[in-house]
């Protein structure tokens, strides 16, 4: 099993897509774990208000599903992912510098974040399946299960790293869970942990996907090559060297 994992990680396509996943999920873990602190201490929201904003966040995420799906009909998954993440990254950095001072601001931030968040959960699993076919073409092995399990391991690792980083940030900022009011430094860092810090990890995810070589055209070529191989014709792998 570990030998197969090692062989998979030698492939550029696998490294790029796993890197994109790991970086996004670290930022996602920080964003999700920080929300309650930010809403409670920075925004002084009541339990009812927090419930409403969480419901709005969920509604926005669901609303983006058909939009992301529609975008992939016009441009490929890779380009849609990059564009969505850039929108979220830029928007969250702007909010990080301007600050969030109202309930409406939280709603707008949620809208901006959900662009990239929805793109990740909708597109990256499909992109991972594209990697499975690239692996089959280049290595003559059907290892979809191994690729998916590797992704599951990376998700668990990313969540752990994100939560550890969140804990370190709060500790260094002087955050105290027992205090009714936090220091200015602690609230400054809970603000950054909801905006700029997740945006940094989104940007790293974008860089990985920019490097990721499977475009819509390349994927079509991979499927054609696999079809020729199954028909008994050995395809020329030279055009696919960048997948390796």
Where are these regions (language model features)?
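Membrane-embedded alpha-helical bundles of multi-pass transporters/translocases
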Residues: 1-244
